Amino acid sequence: MSLGLVGRKCGMTRIFTEDGVSIPVTVVQVEPNKVTQVKTVEKDGYNAIQVTTGFKKRSNVNKPMAGHYAKASVEPGRGLWEFTVDAAAEYQVGSSFDATMFEAGQKVDVRGVSKGKGFQGGVKRHNFATQDATHGNSLSHRVHGSTGQNQTPGRVFKNKKMAGHLGNENVTIQSLEVVRVDAENGLLLLKGGIPGSVGGDIIVTPAVKSW
């Protein structure tokens, strides 16, 4: 993973091009990402930088974390995130990054935690087809049906698509276009939708793929 930014999902809107074309965009608020630690191969076994963003009351920060922030001379943030980099020596503890890291037209990958839906059935979770509404079917309209064979193998295979917990998992959307960068207000406008609820933390990194 290359260096990226941690932001917060604000919601969706749309903007218009000069030709009057409507583009749906997701607004991501990017507060300054401050470097709290630089990890190197010699000391930690790999190159990475650790960043924080946002604000947290000092009364809500425990002593070990307070000491970690104080060592970096950085105000406590709402969390810590890490980005692996090729050359950690290029970064300094206490330095910061903002939305100007990206530019309009650039492709980015966006990671977030999808909305949790709780325990859901196979129809909603895996797009299973429903069974007959009538014609002798009185109870099994939305059940998933058979889950395997008979005595051989006599068990249900792992990862069988069945009812279960839906959502609340890490999701990455690749190659989204940065439509606009509002450096003054610290906003990124990304084309299309991104995972997570409004107010959720989002990680934006340069796209891995070139298409």
UniProtKB/Swiss-Prot annotation:
InterPro entries found in the cross-reference section: Ribosomal_uL3, Ribosomal_uL3_bac/org-type, Ribosomal_uL3_CS, Transl_B-barrel_sf
Domain of life, per lineage: Bacteria
Gene Ontology CC terms: cytosolic large ribosomal subunit
Pfam families: Ribosomal_L3 (PF00297)
Record PTM text: Methylated by PrmB.
UniProt-recorded Gene Ontology molecular function terms: rRNA binding; structural constituent of ribosome
GO terms under biological process: translation
Record PTM N5-methylglutamine, positions in chain: Q151
Keywords: Methylation, Ribonucleoprotein, Ribosomal protein, RNA-binding, rRNA-binding
Subunit structure: Part of the 50S ribosomal subunit. Forms a cluster with proteins L14 and L19.
Similarity comment: family membership: Belongs to the universal ribosomal protein uL3 family.
Protein function: One of the primary rRNA binding proteins, it binds directly near the 3'-end of the 23S rRNA, where it nucleates assembly of the 50S subunit.
UniProt cross-references to HAMAP family, sorted A to Z: Ribosomal_uL3_B
The protein's name in its UniProt record: Large ribosomal subunit protein uL3
Organism the protein comes from: Francisella tularensis subsp. tularensis (strain SCHU S4 / Schu 4)
